[in-house]
Amino acid sequence: ANYFDVEAVSNSIKPGAYARLPYTSKVLAENLVRRATEDQKSIGLKQILNSENSQDFPWYPARVVCHDILGQTALVDLAGLREAIAAQGGNPSNVNPVVPTQLIVDLSLAVEHGGHEPDARLKNQEIEQRRNDDRFHFIEWTKKAFQNVDVVPPGNGIMHQINLERMSPVIHKVNGIAYPDTCLLY
């Protein structure tokens, strides 16, 4: 795979500075070199290399990980936008998240049956399904309707555990270019 030589670009601005950067700053610098306009790149890299924070610069996450409640709200907005575009004669299937979005359905299980009861977990999951049927139906629809949306169903763990243990690729490779994983937890 190919990659952007962030060290060379950084050292052309401030020789030797890249080697002294913390890892997180190197990831931000790579993101700027790969994605930003020349002006944004220049402003952002100078700030990173000089440990300054006088101006904002763009950051483009490789993916977004959403808790189901917050992510569902965003997907409802996208569904509404699709309806409006269709009403105007446009193609609603053109409305999709720009970056891969992972919706994790977690933390909605209410405990009605205790661990001493046979099949307590199964009974609690059945109650959860019944109480949240409309919500789960919408979430399942979004998985099929939108490109760039992946859904992790309930019962698989909490958001941070799932992200760290199962979802983070550490390095992405798209169109022959390798770059570090960056994630916005929403």
Regions found by a protein language model. Name each.
Residues 1-186:
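Fe-S-dependent hydro-lyases/dehydratases of central metabolism
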